[in-house]
């Protein structure tokens, strides 16, 4: 099984020892080579950093370092939005109203035959994508 990691999951894992135990257990049981990120996740992390920067430059700098580590660690396993993802997004967005980034993540997972790992399962329910919420179960 290969996995597309949503922003809420990679952010949870960043917490280290404060990470939710079920998420930590799931993360420990998967191989790095089976984990993928969307470029949109990197964008969401960047947006968060820029939101923090005006009020806490030190925290923003720490998050910058973490983001650089994530980009380095995932390297070629960062997936962009190409024509196939865009067309799939168009099809699934016609099914019902879905936040754009969530629908693009679902489309990316569908195109690349990945399981979307997210806490926000309701956002992609009924779109045909396989989903895992590791907050609920470390084994499924």
Indicate residue ranges for each PLM-predicted region.
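A generic structural signal for short hydrophobic patches within well-formed alpha-helices
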Residues: 10, 42-45, 86, 124
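Acidic, PIN/NYN-like endoribonuclease modules and their adjacent C-terminal/linker elements
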Residues: 1-2, 106, 110-140
């Amino acid at each position: 099984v290969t996995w597309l990691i949503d922003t809420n999951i990679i952010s949870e894992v960043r917490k280290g020892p404060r990470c939710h135990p079920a998420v930590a257990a799931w993360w420990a049981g998967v191989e790095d080579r089976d984990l993928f990120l969307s470029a949109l996740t990197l964008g969401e992390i960047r947006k968060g950093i820029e939101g923090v920067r005006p009020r806490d430059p030190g925290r923003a700098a720490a998050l910058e370092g973490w983001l650089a580590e994530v980009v380095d660690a995932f390297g070629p396993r960062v997936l962009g939005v190409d024509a196939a993802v865009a067309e799939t997004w168009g099809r699934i967005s016609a099914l019902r109203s879905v936040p754009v980034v969530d629908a693009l993540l679902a489309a990316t997972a569908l195109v690349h035959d990945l399981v979307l790992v997210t806490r926000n399962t309701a956002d992609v329910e009924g779109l045909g994508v396989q989903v895992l919420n590791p907050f609920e179960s470390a084994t499924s």
